Amino acid sequence: MRLEAATVESINPQEFISAVSPSLHSGNLEQALDYVRSRWSARQIVELLQYKCPEVRKVAALSLSVVGDRSAVAPLAVALHDVEPAVTDVAEHALWSIWFRIGKPAAVSLVKCGNNHMHHGNYDCAIEKFTQAIREDEDFAEAYNQRAIAYYLSERFEASIENCKLALTRMPQHFGAMSGMGHCHAHLEQWRQARHCYRLALAIHPRLEGIQTSLDQIDQLLRDNPCIS
């Protein structure tokens, strides 16, 4: 007996926009996203990221910020290359939202606690919470990335680089970890390594804020000083 693979019913794009747009346009974002969550799965919404209408692609990316899971990361990373800046902006937001929530519940809670410490400048406490999160879930890429940020803010750049690498091992599309590694190399005046990281970050997210400027500055520095490492 042959078992047929389960199929996912496609969403009608016009129905999708008609159902969600009124709440969005009235500013009731939560109502719109609650409706999306109740009607469609992430797998269905992902298909709309390639639809010809930019508004459909944008609303699909916004919806994935709430219902998306690990399977939505690769399609959203493709959406970072969309010709419409509004779509790439929402895709970036959706990726951050997914990255922060796809760990085990205990690890997600510890990362939130660590972020609170980091916000108040308590970097060692933040690092301890992020480390605890990693013990709870060794595959939680964002725990490594947040620990990298805490190390960066406390000027422990080598440790930050190592944690960026650990994050990227688990989430290769993590433009934040890649650009963060570039910042660390720049602070260490390792200009060629910084340039390499910035180029890779832009390959993932071509419109990543500030990175093209940093890359241009390093390119100019290396042109003016060819002996610099």
What residue spans do the PLM features occupy?
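Amphipathic alpha-helical scaffolding segments comprising HEAT/armadillo-like alpha-solenoid repeats
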Residues: 2-16, 35-50, 69-81, 104-111, ...
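Register position in tetratricopeptide repeats
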Residues: 66, 97-101, 119, 153, ...
